[in-house]
UniProtKB/Swiss-Prot annotation:
Pfam families: LIM. This is Rhombotin-1. CDD domains: LIM1_LMO1_LMO3 (cd09388), LIM2_LMO1_LMO3 (cd09389). Expressed in the brain and not in the thymus. May be involved in gene regulation within neural lineage cells potentially by direct DNA binding or by binding to other transcription factors. The gene is Lmo1. GO terms for molecular function: metal ion binding.
Length: 156
């Protein structure tokens, strides 16, 4: 398997020369394995170079890794957290590319703007939310809207 670091095109997976053990940037132990990863000008055990969000092994996932805000990320989590520079779907203000965001389908939100648009309830990790007629709703407001027929009259 050949894994390339997108930034400099240098193979991340290397064969370690005998007798010269490198120190792992992840766990600070000597790398005794035959194979090691080199990324961000540091050496890593294959098990130690992981995405800070999903914990996937970056040597297995694909050819690139991403780093931002002192985080090492896989492509999926980098795009999920930082996306591209654009506007918040709730407040329409600019979202800088370095800022963490929330996503719901194609919409991107500031963390502070990701709340029920009827009652302003903020969501915590794991909370259920609904996207109806391009509005973020908590479960209570979503169910009330269905019961009283509000959403049927707002079909877009």
């Amino acid at each position: 398997m050949m894994v390339l670091d997108k930034e400099d095109g240098v193979p991340m997976l290397s064969v370690q020369p005998k007798g010269k053990q490198k120190g792992c940037a992840g766990c600070n132990r000597k790398i005794k394995d035959r194979y090691l990863l080199k990324a961000l000008d540091k050496y890593w055990h294959e098990d130690c170079l992981k995405c800070a969000c999903c914990d996937c092994r970056l040597g297995e996932v694909g050819s690139t890794l991403y780093t931002k805000a002192n985080l090492i990320l896989c492509r999926r989590d980098y795009l999920r957290l930082f996306g591209t520079t654009g506007n918040c779907a709730a407040c329409s203000k600019l979202i800088p590319a370095f800022e963490m965001v929330m996503r719901a389908r194609d919409n991107v939100y500031h963390l502070d703007c990701f709340a029920c648009q009827l009652c302003n309830q903020r969501f915590c990790v794991g909370d259920k939310f609904f996207l109806k007629n391009n509005m973020i709703l908590c479960q209570v407001d979503y169910e009330e809207g269905h019961l009283n027929g509000t959403f049927e009259s707002q079909v877009q």
